[in-house]
Amino acid sequence: TFLDNTHRNSMHYWNDELHEYLQGTANTYTFTVSSKHEDAVYTVEGNKVAFVYNGKDYYLNIVHVEKDEFTVTATAWSLSFELINENVGAYKSESAMSFEEYVTAFDPERTVRIGINEVSDKRISNEWTGEATVLSRLFSVANVFDAEIEFQTVLNDDYSLKEIVMNVYREHSDNNTGVGEFRG
């Protein structure tokens, strides 16, 4: 199903709002469609919404839907929020490890691929006690490495998900721009 306000027969949307959060560049997207359109049946929790906006790819999971006889309003979260669905346990490194080695330990399914890695020269020993979500642990690893992370969605030409890239930047300081700098 395609949402396209310029195409007469496509399902049109309105009241759409995209929020971008600095930490990890997570996103939420809310939009409304007509419940009378035949494709409105696909606006359900668990389905995906993919689009390109200002040259950036977005791939979001619909997590909440409100329906009445006239409209369907959906809220979708970016896939970085998907990393909150899996937990990891306590972990202690046996020796100093690179950022990438920690990511492999905490994301063995390779949900994300590391792109830019400005801390690739560092090796650190650390211990985590207790359980945490994969997303929380990745932010914790970034903190240990004095780094900031962002997640970048990459779509195929048909708008299916190609991959999620995690870029790692040195933490913002007088000498480093961190995530906040546009890196087009």
Kindly label every feature range from the protein language model.
Residues 8, 36-40, 48, 113, ...:
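Surface-exposed charge patches in extracellular/virion surface proteins
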Residues 9-22, 62-67, 151-155:
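Short amphipathic beta-strand and strand-loop transition segments with alternating hydrophobic
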Residues 5-12, 49-57, 137-143:
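Short, solvent-exposed secondary-structure boundary motifs
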Residues 57, 64-83, 118-184:
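Short beta-strand-centered interaction patches in the first periplasmic/extracellular domains
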Residues 1, 102-110, 138-145, 149:
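Hydrophobic, Leu/Ile/Phe/Ala-enriched alpha-helical segments that form helix-helix packing faces
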Residues 37-121, 127:
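Surface-exposed cap/loop segments at beta↔alpha junctions
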Residues 1-44, 77-83:
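Juxtamembrane "anchor/assembly" segments of surface/extracellular structural proteins
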Residues 14, 22, 53, 113, ...:
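Intrinsically disordered, low-complexity segments enriched in small/polar residues
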